[in-house]
Structures are given as structure tokens and as C-alpha cells.
Amino acid sequence: MKGILNVGNTCYFNTSLQCLVHVPIIKSLFVERGYNGPCSFTKGFSEFTRKYWDDSLKITFNVNNLLGEFVNKFPRFVVGRQHDAQEAVLCIIDILENSVPELKKHFYGKKIQETIWPGGKKTHEEIFSIHILTSTSTSLGEMMRNSLKWNVLNDYEDDDGKVHHVATTRCLF
């Protein structure tokens, strides 16, 4: 069994690391290839990932050096204070994808917004992580399904500047 030493309100960081090393592409990339680039955080993360998945090691990890590198890049994560694990995960992903650009295609997909009005149709494609519309639901699946539903737009202006009384739009993932 393996764990990460909590040195006072570092559970957000420890949890973030544990989540990310279980992402198959991250595990595969850093265990099989490692990282030899200039980013000291990514070097430390790569080493941590390799050791984490080394079955011969049954240890508790001290990630203070890695945490220090993280705080150097994101000073708002003051050591000793409570922080949000989701925010830390996104910041770690930001570091990793800048160090290893091929990771971007695994963390981001495409969102296609489709808008239809009388006499026309337009699609707009953009890279995204995930978009969920605000909802009172507690079910992630329901929130995702609701994000795909058609919405009515009143007085929609198309790319040619023509205003249409009504149009419908939806996002496709």
C-alpha cells in the first residue's frame, strides 16, 4: 500500500496527484517514457509517477519538493492553507500540458455549437475541456444530457448581420 504524507493542509495536493497518476495516458507516458525536459515540476511529477507505479516500493511518499515547485508556479497555493483539489488538478494539468504538449489532445476535446435559423445554419467548433450548464440536478449524467439539448435564441443575428426572430442552438461534444 502506498500513500502520500500530509504535512498540514496538503491533502488537496496529495489528492490531485493521486487522481492524475491514475489517468491511463499520464501513467503510460511517465512510467514508460519519463520526462527529461526543462520543467522541474514535470520532472518531479514524472519521478513520482514512476515510483508510485513501482510494485516493489511500499512507501509513504514525501512530495514536499514537488509541492514547492507547484507553489513556485502558482503562488496562490500558500503552503499550510486549505485549497481546492479541483483547482489544483487543473493547474497541474496546465503545467503538464505545457511540458508535454501531446497531452493536450487527451485532456481537451472539441465543442461544436450548431445554430439553425430560418434559411440558414452555422456551426462553430472550438477546443474545450468540458462545459456543463448550470443545473439544480445532482446527477452529472443529467447535467451533461441537458447541455446537449436545443435552446431557443430570440433575435439572433447571423454572420451577415441579418436578425432572425428565432433560432435554435445546441452544443455537441
PLM regions: where:
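UBL (ubiquitin/ubiquitin-like) substrate-recognition surfaces
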Residues: 1-173
